[in-house]
């Protein structure tokens, strides 16, 4: 069982009480522009080298509006190159995008951000939730090794940025109880590798999707006796109800960890109110909230805001 005394985020002066006020959050910052609902040409990691001035100005605006934390996505697939999705063949990003990640994290720190979650978004055949069958084959091992080596090779770059960071090993990557055996094997193997090589202090494990309280029962199977110190949940709608269910589910498996909200609707007054109202009744802290650049009523499926400069509704609720 995780010892409570070991729970630590990479945040100076972290309070661990369940009634501790949340730390100031911020945004998922993945795109510096958008056309209608199309985000693909504008990925910040893919294109930082050609949009540096724009990105730095946007970071400065976000920080001036009170944001203190970011989540940056590494969208990758073996042979894809969309302007957001970056090729990861061989278990690494191209040299330019590796430099972009380093420069982006440094720029965020210079703008005043104090912590970054770096989330890995494996797509296409790199995404284990798309794998079919029940037997782990050489094909699955090949893609697993690509994804693992990508994390392994980017860790020194993230550390070199000299800003506090946490790694999300797979966006919404905790399988449900009814998910494929292959996905469960993938998550367990990747967690074992990361936790044994890099430890627990620089990761949230795998983030969990909205309405995912049922997946909490899978955490002991994925993390075994070595779970992360903090967990990442995404909330879209009925946030107070979801937080209560998450808190109860974690208590049932005897996980004392605090959580972060890694995604929520963009600058949404109702989301902020629901999150803030639920926190005092929880048996664990909610450290901070990160908004996704999508408004509640948008017809877009993924993103409709770039940059995500506003955060006032969350700030007004102490988030």
Where are these regions (language model features)?
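Glycoside hydrolase catalytic-domain groove-lining segments
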Residues: 180-275
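Substrate-binding cleft of secreted/luminal carbohydrate-active enzymes
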Residues: 235-238, 255-319
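Structural preference for beta-strand elements that scaffold enzyme active sites
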Residues: 22-26, 69-71, 115-117, 164-168, ...
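Surface-exposed, active-site-proximal loop segments in enzymatic domains
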Residues: 35-47, 76-99, 124-142, 302-306
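N-terminal carbohydrate-binding accessory modules
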Residues: 18-69, 310-317
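Active-site groove signature of glycoside hydrolases
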Residues: 117-133, 148-181
């Amino acid at each position: 069982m995780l010892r409570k005394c070991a729970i630590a985020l990479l945040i100076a002066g972290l309070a661990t009480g369940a009634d501790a006020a949340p730390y100031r959050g911020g945004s998922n910052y993945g795109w510096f522009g958008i056309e209608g609902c199309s985000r693909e040409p504008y990925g910040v990691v893919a294109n930082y080298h050609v949009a540096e001035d724009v990105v730095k100005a946007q970071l400065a605006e976000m920080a001036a509006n009170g944001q203190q934390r970011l989540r940056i996505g590494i969208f990758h697939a073996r042979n894809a190159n969309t302007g957001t999705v970056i090729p990861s063949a061989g278990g690494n990003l191209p040299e330019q995008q590796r430099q972009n990640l380093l420069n982006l994290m440094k720029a965020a720190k210079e703008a005043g951000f104090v912590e970054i979650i770096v989330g890995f978004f494996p797509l296409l055949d790199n995404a284990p939730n798309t794998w079919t069958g029940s037997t782990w084959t050489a094909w699955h091992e090949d893609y697993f090794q690509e994804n693992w080596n990508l994390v392994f090779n980017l860790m020194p770059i993230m550390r070199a940025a000299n800003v506090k960071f946490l790694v999300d090993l797979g966006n919404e990557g905790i399988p449900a109880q009814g998910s494929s055996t292959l996905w469960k094997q993938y998550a367990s193997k990747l967690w074992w590798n990361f936790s044994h090589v890099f430890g627990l202090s620089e990761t949230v494990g795998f983030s969990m999707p909205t309405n995912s309280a049922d997946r909490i029962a899978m955490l002991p199977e994925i993390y075994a006796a070595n779970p992360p110190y903090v967990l990442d949940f995404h909330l879209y709608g009925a946030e107070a109800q979801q937080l209560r269910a998450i808190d109860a589910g974690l208590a049932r498996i005897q996980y004392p960890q605090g959580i972060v909200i890694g995604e929520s609707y963009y600058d949404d007054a109702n989301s902020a109110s629901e999150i803030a109202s639920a926190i005092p009744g929880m048996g664990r802290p909610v450290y901070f909230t990160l908004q996704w650049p999508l408004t509640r009523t948008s017809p877009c499926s993924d993103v409709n805001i770039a940059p995500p400069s506003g955060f006032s509704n969350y700030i007004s609720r102490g988030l």
